[in-house]
Amino acid sequence: MRRLLLLRHAKAEPGGPDQDDHDRVLAERGLTDADAMARYLKAQGYQPDRILCSTSMRTRQTVAPVLREVPAPIEFVEALYHAPPGRIAALAQDADNDIKVLLMVGHNPGLEQCAALLAREPVKPKELHRHDLLEEKFPTGALAVLEFDITSWKKLSPCSGKLVDFVRPRDL
């Protein structure tokens, strides 16, 4: 089994006219939400074996409390910056086989589209509720957790994952 955690960066300050989008920082609410999501990861036992994080400032700030709560080796990946869903899935497929739990910290719309691409159709009411929330919106700071009955990340494919959790900062 493999578990993929998709965490969208927390709420960021709007960029100024002379500010590069890559350099935007978290808003006060974003800092609070990032802390809450990090505590949630720990409380749920979502201990990643590896973290892949976009190189943007807001994703770096989002992952900082995560590293305190659930420390793991991290790689900052330029290709995750505003990555489309196919690129996100491809990065997961490239993960080493010894990694059972992979956390990716990035941006929308790519993360939301990737979660929707990989999640199978819900079969139970609880799954249906999670899917409905995911389809409604993948807000800043939200986390989607997908489980795959595969032995290698290379076998990751569309509609093959079970959406076992979807949580937004406001849910905590």
Task: Name what the model sees in each region.
Residues 44-46, 94-100:
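Glycine-rich phosphate-binding loop signature in dinucleotide/nucleotide-binding domains
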